[in-house]
Amino acid sequence: MAAVMKALAVASPISARAQPRRCPAGSSGGPSQSLHSSFGGVSLQCRRTKPASLHRSRPSMQVVMMAARPAIQFIQGTDEQTIPDVRLTKSRDGTNGVAIFTFDQPSVFDSSAELGDITGFYMIDDEGVLQSVDVSAKFVNGKPALIEAKYVMRTPREWDRFMRFMERYSQANGLQFVKK
């Protein structure tokens, strides 16, 4: 744990000028290392412990990370239950592209009366939120029938991030990619 804290502190841009120091002899009896941050004078104490052995006789604790299920939302906090049809376009040079999501009879129409208006298009996963305000509704006989949302990717980095979201979303919802 101490090594992790030290690595985080050293890797932080705030503590780029960290200086190792020894504690006074009268402190807790053993040498320790202190990293000082230039941010508000806050210091982080990292006590040295016995080096970890490579072979442990007892089971160690395992860290379990829970990942958020990928979701699409039109109203923040309310997941869209309808699975969309997604079309992708990409420029020849690969620098930009557009994803067009079509939701036929989306569940947001059922809940928008209680929860409020559609505020945008939000794709949420464990990396964060991708969002767009390019959302339009199609009406049939005066009633909302479908929603079309566009997400524009202007850089290869945005394209890669979108593809990571779509991979997670498709795995969670049983979708597959069909190239046409």
UniProtKB/Swiss-Prot annotation:
Q: Which domain of life is it from?
A: Eukaryota
Region (Disordered) spans which residues? 16-39
Under the heading Pfam families, the entry gives: Psb28 (PF03912)
How is this protein positioned relative to the membrane?
Answer: Peripheral membrane protein
Whether Plastid counts among this entry's keywords is yes
Q: Which UniProt keywords apply?
A: Chloroplast, Membrane, Photosynthesis, Photosystem II, Plastid, Thylakoid, Transit peptide
Span of the transit peptide along the chain = 1-64
> A Gene Ontology CC term for this entry?
photosystem II oxygen evolving complex
Just give the chief location class: plastid
Compartments where located: Plastid, Chloroplast thylakoid membrane
Q: Does the keyword Glycosyltransferase apply?
A: no
Annotated GO biological process: photosynthesis
Return the Gene3D superfamilies for the record.
Answer: Photosystem II Psb28
Q: Which NCBIfam families match?
A: PS_II_psb28
Q: How does it assemble?
A: Part of the photosystem II complex.
Q: Which family does it belong to?
A: Belongs to the Psb28 family.
Q: What is this protein called?
A: Photosystem II reaction center PSB28 protein, chloroplastic
Natural source organism = Oryza sativa subsp. japonica (Rice)
Q: What is the phylogenetic placement of the source species in the record?
A: Eukaryota, Viridiplantae, Streptophyta, Embryophyta, Tracheophyta
